[in-house]
C-alpha cells in the first residue's frame, strides 16, 4: 500500500498521545509498518511504545552535537513495540524560541536521512495543542500529512479546540492535499457524549470515526509505560483501539471541513445542555444583582 501520513491534533490534555500510541500499537499488531513522529516539546509521544520516560529528541541531540547535520539517523530513531519507528522532534527550553521550529528541523532531517522507507505503511505526527500555528502546522502545511484526525471529547473546551483545528486546516486543505479524516472521541463520560460528537462532526462536514470509551485499564497500562494492546491484549479497551485502527485503514471519507461559527457551536452546546441557554437580561450582572 502507498504510504499514508496522518497528523493527530487535539486539545492539550485530551489524551491525544495515549490514543495515538494505542492506535499505532494496534496497527503494528495487525502487521502494518508504522513510524511515530512526536511533534511536541514534552516528548511524550513515544513513551508507551518504547517503555521509556522520554525519548531523546532531535533538538536535544542536535544541540549536543553542534548541529542537526552532525547527527545520524540511528541517533534519533528508536524501534519499539511491534517494530514501530519512534522519533521525537523536541523543542527549545521553555520561554526560549519557537518550538514549532523543532518540528520543521526534525521532519526535514528525517526526510534527508531516509527515515521514510519504502516499507512504511503509515506515519503518524502527534502534534501539540489547540491551534494549528505556523510551526506546528508543518506536517500539513508542507503536504507531509494528507490526513488529519482530531481527538476530542464532549467537554466544551475540547469541542471548541476541535472546531478551531478544523478551521486552521481549511487554508492548507485549499492550497494542498490535506483532508480531515474525522473526529476521535476520547470519552470523558459526559452526558450524551457520542451523540454530541456525532452532531459536531456532522456540523463541520466530517464523521466521528470512533468513540473510545473511558476505561481505567488505560491508566494501569500507562503506569507501566505500555499501551493497552501490549499490557492487556484481551481487554475490551484493546479491542476498541483495534476497531479504531481498522476504521482508519478503511477510511475513505476525507474532506475539506466546513467549521462551525461560534454561534452555531454555542447553539449545539445549548441543544445538548452543555451550555445554558443565554439570557441577555442577565449578561454583565453580578451575583448580588440577581
From Swiss-Prot:
The gene is vnfH. Its EC number is 1.18.6.1. This is Nitrogenase iron protein 2. CDD domains: NifH. GO terms for molecular function: 4 iron, 4 sulfur cluster binding; ATP binding; metal ion binding; nitrogenase activity. It holds the Pfam family Fer4_NifH. The keyword Metal-binding applies. Belongs to the NifH/BchL/ChlL family. The modification ADP-ribosylarginine is found at residue 101. Keywords: 4Fe-4S, ADP-ribosylation, ATP-binding, Iron, Iron-sulfur, Metal-binding, Nitrogen fixation, Nucleotide-binding, Oxidoreductase. This subunit is associated with the vanadium-iron nitrogenase component 2. Its cofactor is [4Fe-4S] cluster. PANTHER family: LIGHT-INDEPENDENT PROTOCHLOROPHYLLIDE REDUCTASE IRON-SULFUR ATP-BINDING PROTEIN. The key enzymatic reactions in nitrogen fixation are catalyzed by the nitrogenase complex, which has 2 components: the iron protein (component 2) and a component 1 which is either a molybdenum-iron protein, a vanadium-iron, or an iron-iron protein. NCBIfam families: nifH (TIGR01287). GO terms for biological process: nitrogen fixation. The reversible ADP-ribosylation of Arg-101 inactivates the nitrogenase reductase and regulates nitrogenase activity. SUPFAM superfamilies: P-loop containing nucleoside triphosphate hydrolases. Homodimer. InterPro entries: NifH/chlL_CS, NifH/frxC, Nitrogenase_Fe_NifH, P-loop_NTPase. ATP binds at residues 10-17.
Amino acid at each position: 500500500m502507498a504510504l499514508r501520513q496522518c497528523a493527530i491534533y487535539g486539545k492539550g490534555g485530551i489524551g491525544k498521545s495515549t490514543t495515538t500510541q494505542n492506535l499505532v500499537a494496534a496497527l503494528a499488531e495487525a502487521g502494518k509498518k508504522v513510524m511515530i513522529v512526536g511533534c511536541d516539546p514534552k516528548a511524550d509521544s513515544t513513551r508507551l511504545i518504547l517503555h521509556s520516560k522520554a525519548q531523546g529528541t532531535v533538538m536535544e541531540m542536535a544541540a549536543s552535537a553542534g548541529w542537526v547535520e552532525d547527527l545520524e539517523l540511528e541517533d534519533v530513531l528508536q524501534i519499539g513495540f511491534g517494530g514501530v519507528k519512534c522519533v521525537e522532534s523536541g523543542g527549545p527550553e521553555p520561554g526560549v524560541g519557537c518550538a514549532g521550529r523543532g518540528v520543521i528541523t526534525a521532519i526535514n532531517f528525517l526526510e534527508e536521512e531516509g527515515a521514510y522507507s519504502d516499507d512504511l505503511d503509515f506515519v503518524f505526527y502527534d502534534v501539540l495543542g489547540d491551534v494549528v500555528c505556523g510551526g506546528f502546522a508543518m506536517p500539513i502545511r508542507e503536504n507531509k500529512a494528507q490526513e488529519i484526525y482530531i481527538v476530542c471529547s464532549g467537554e466544551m473546551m475540547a469541542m471548541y479546540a476541535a472546531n478551531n483545528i478544523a478551521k486552521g486546516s481549511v487554508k492548507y486543505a485549499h492550497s494542498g492535499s490535506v483532508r480531515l479524516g474525522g473526529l476521535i472521541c476520547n470519552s470523558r463520560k459526559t452526558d450524551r457524549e457520542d451523540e454530541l460528537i456525532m452532531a459536531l462532526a456532522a456540523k463541520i462536514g466530517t464523521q466521528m470515526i470512533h468513540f473510545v470509551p473511558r476505561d481505567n485499564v488505560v491508566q494501569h497500562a500507562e503506569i507501566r509505560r505500555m499501551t493497552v494492546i501490549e499490557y492487556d491484549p484481551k481487554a475490551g479497551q484493546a479491542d476498541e483501539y483495534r476497531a479504531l485502527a481498522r476504521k482508519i485503514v478503511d477510511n475513505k471519507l476525507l474532506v475539506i471541513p466546513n467549521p462551525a461559527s461560534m454561534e452555531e457551536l454555542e447553539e449545539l452546546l445549548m441543544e445538548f445542555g452543555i451550555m445554558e441557554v443565554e439570557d441577555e437580561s442577565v449578561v454583565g450582572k453580578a451575583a448580588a444583582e440577581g
